[in-house]
Amino acid sequence: MTGPERKIQLAKVAHVYYKHKDLERAHEFAMDFGFEEVSRTNDKIYYRGYGREPFVYCVIKADENEFGGTAFAVENEEELEYASKTLPNATEIYELKDAPGGGKCVTFKEPVDGFLWHLVYGQKLRDEERALPTLKFNFPTKKERAPNTYQRFEQRPAPVHKLGHFGFCHTDWQKAFDFYHSHFNFKPSEIQYDENGKNCMVFSRLDRGDELVDHHSFFFFQGPKAHVHHSSFETHDFDTQALGHDWLRHKGYQNLWGVGRHIMGSQIFDYWFNRDGFVMEHYVDGDLLNSKDDTKWSSATPDTLYVWGPDLPDNFLV
């Protein structure tokens, strides 16, 4: 089979959709997780973070609880036109009529397990993002805080800034790898292999040349049953993240894993189940890379996933 003529140029990961039977139950979690409601229709609720994206998360009323796909912004409208003509099961370009920020979109199904993807262009960004305070710290040999000042915090959800990444379990790792990395400007930041030396997990970033980007905006691993693993949202700093952890704990939500520090990507992580069993992550302090950084390889063992934190749950990669 011949490959595509060229790669579709993705600019950033934009937003994600989840479908729920009980929209108000999904909304309750969204507010406790730190999203801000932007608008709603009869069957959708849109949420933003405190960044400039018009929305980063959307829940949709549906007969079943299921993943609704992730959207990436493309470089220009020509990329949308090319995508609509070359990607499998792709739609024509259509208007995002009820979505905050508007814009145009192409939706397609990837050929391995049929996950939905959305490519968008022309969304109007918010005029400005809300600035949160950058704290100063008193280290043993360097005291940054002014004299007679205090660190005081408010108990509240951890406000979301942006969608950082998402991930799948795919049933054919190599086929998925070949499709994504030949059709889009993804570059593997880290690849892991199993005990037989077979590749089984990849963390991929967008190749934007010299521009610094997150260590990964997309990851996937090999498994017997295809499913979305989690969507991850950046919050402000570690105190904010820890306050959000306590907020969710006191609200009775189930923690999957965290708080801890990843090795690949370096993020401080905190994974939670919503009421319908989908996994959402708060993260802070992730690595930034550009095209000059080469792919790293490692064995897929539990100790490569984190350097500190609670023990790795048995069901984390199920």
Model-assigned labels for residue ranges:
Residues 2-6, 12-21, 61-86, 88-159, 162-171, 202-205, 252-318, ...:
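Vicinal oxygen chelate
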Residues 8-54, 111, 168-213:
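Core segments of cupin and vicinal oxygen chelate
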Residues 1-24, 69-70, 131-174, 187, ...:
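N-terminal beta-strand motif that seeds the catalytic metal site of vicinal oxygen chelate
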Residues 16-18, 29, 38, 48, ...:
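A structural feature that tracks compact, well-ordered secondary-structure segments
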Residues 1-107, 121:
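An N-terminus-focused feature that recognizes amino-terminal "leader" regions
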Residues 173-260, 267, 274-276:
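Structured core of small recognition/catalytic domains
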